[in-house]
C-alpha cells in the first residue's frame, strides 16, 4: 500500500501541476471564449453604438426650430386658429431662409467695412436691404425695440 500511497501523491503532484497548468490554459482558453462571448457583446455594443448614432440622430433631430415661437405668435394674433404640421414646417423653413439671407448680407457688410464683428447696425442695414418697403420699416422698429429692451434689462 505504501507504493500506492507514493504513487497517488506523486500522481497528485503532477495532477495538481497539470490542473494548475490546465487551469492556466483554461483561464487563457476561458478568456478566449469570454472574448468570443464579448464579440456578440461587441456586436451589442456596435448596436448600442448604432444606438449612440441613433442618439446622435436624435440630437440632430433636436435641431433648433422656430416652431414654438411661430405658435406663440399665432396665438397672439389669432388665438382660435391652429396650424398644421406641414404649414409649420413651411413657416420654419421660411424663417430659416430669411435668417440665412440676413446673416449673409450682414457678413458682407462687415467685410466691406473691414470689421470683424457683426453689430446691430449691420443687422439693421441688412434688414433694410433684404426686406421690402413697409416690412423693412416694421422689422427695424421691432428690432430696435427688442435691442432696447434687452440692454435695459
From Swiss-Prot:
UniProt-annotated location(s): Nucleus; Chromosome
Entry keyword set: Acetylation, Chromosome, DNA-binding, Isopeptide bond, Nucleosome core, Nucleus, Ubl conjugation
Main location: nucleus
Residue stretches of biased makeup (Basic and acidic residues): 1-28, 36-53
Cross-link Glycyl lysine isopeptide (Lys-Gly) (interchain with G-Cter in ubiquitin) per UniProt, renumbered positions: 149
Classification via InterPro entries: Histone-fold, Histone_H2A/H2B/H3, Histone_H2B, HISTONE_H2B_site
Job of this protein: Core component of nucleosome. Nucleosomes wrap and compact DNA into chromatin, limiting DNA accessibility to the cellular machineries which require DNA as a template. Histones thereby play a central role in transcription regulation, DNA repair, DNA replication and chromosomal stability. DNA accessibility is regulated via a complex set of post-translational modifications of histones, also called histone code, and nucleosome remodeling.
Similarity comment: family membership: Belongs to the histone H2B family.
Protein's name according to its UniProt entry: Histone H2B.10
Protein source organism: Oryza sativa subsp. japonica (Rice)
Encoding gene, per UniProt annotation: H2B.10
